[in-house]
């Protein structure tokens, strides 16, 4: 049988597939992981906001706390869940959960979203 040999170019494409797809910025991720603190991951869609406190592990990131803005509906919030007010309340819920689990600080991770003053991302912070 003939042994398959992968070229360097092919290997590089395999290693950085998520970068090529526009899903991961490895330079920013490395800077966040160097802090050795948990990350507050904020992801926004048109209708919802998701907040997670994530800790790095070699086997994969471990989610310590997860809060979704759809949980506001259970608490009586009848308004839209993708706006600034909902993001603020979701962030408040995440803060209370973090206090109950004795998490004092975290590093903000907004991913590939642009950092804009007054945005939903900072309302959740």
For the regions a protein language model found, what residue spans apply to each?
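Generic non-transmembrane alpha-helix signal with a bias for helix starts/N-cap capping motifs
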Residues: 91, 120-121
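Intrinsically disordered, Lys/Arg-rich N-terminal extensions and targeting peptides
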Residues: 1-58, 66, 70-74
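Beta-rich strand-turn-strand
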Residues: 98-105, 116
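Extended, alpha-helix-rich binding/interface surfaces that flank or overlap catalytic cores
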Residues: 124
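Acidic helix/loop or adjacent segment enriched in Glu/Asp that either coordinates divalent metal
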Residues: 75-100
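Acidic, metal-coordinating catalytic cores used for nucleic-acid/nucleotide bond scission
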Residues: 111-120
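Compact nucleic-acid interaction/catalytic patches
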Residues: 62
């Amino acid at each position: 049988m003939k042994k398959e040999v992968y070229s360097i170019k092919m290997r590089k494409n395999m290693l950085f597939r998520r970068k090529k797809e526009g899903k991961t910025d490895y330079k920013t991720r490395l800077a966040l992981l160097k802090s050795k603190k948990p990350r507050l991951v904020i992801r926004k869609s048109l209708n919802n906001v998701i907040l997670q406190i994530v800790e790095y592990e070699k086997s994969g990131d471990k989610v310590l706390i997860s809060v979704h803005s759809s949980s506001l509906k259970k608490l009586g919030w009848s308004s839209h869940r993708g706006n600034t007010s909902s993001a603020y309340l979701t962030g408040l819920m995440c803060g209370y959960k973090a206090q109950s689990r004795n998490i004092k600080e975290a590093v903000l991770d907004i991913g590939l979203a642009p950092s804009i003053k007054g945005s939903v991302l900072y309302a959740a912070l």
